[in-house]
Amino acid sequence: AESTLYQQRRTILTPLPKTGIHRLQAAHDVWDAIGSHVSTMTPEAHDATFAAVSHLPHMLAFAAVNALMSQPQGAAFLDMAGPGFRDFSRIAASDASVWRDILSANQTEVLAQVAHFRVALDQFEAALKQGDAAALQHLIQQASDVRSAWTLQAGNACNKASEN
């Protein structure tokens, strides 16, 4: 155990309607005392949020590696992969049984995020098929701007010493 494990880390409490205010405050106080940044959201908001920022990205990493390796030249492609693929696919090495359970338990929200992703991917595909370099650049720039602004925000995961 490491005493600083939860310091400066986000902890989200997801109280149920039957959760008493005193119990919720006690849980908040414990996490706060060990240095965690504590917030509260409904279980439904939690499931939607983490389907978007955790569950879908894991599924995409699994799918990207599987898609690569399903091709006859997949192993050769992998031999040539660099830091971009390494960074993108890092989470594909996650425990399969843990992620099977997470994705299954949050199926509805994950499928909603898959639909959103499919729309975004279709936009890229359409721009490529149409040879629309301006649309392609716009889609890339839009994502780049959001990602850059997010990394500058105080308190987000990218501003921590390590991104675990």
Residues of each region from the PLM?
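Substrate/ligand-engaging "lid" and interaction regions
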Residues: 38, 49-87
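SAM-dependent methyltransferases
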Residues: 133-164
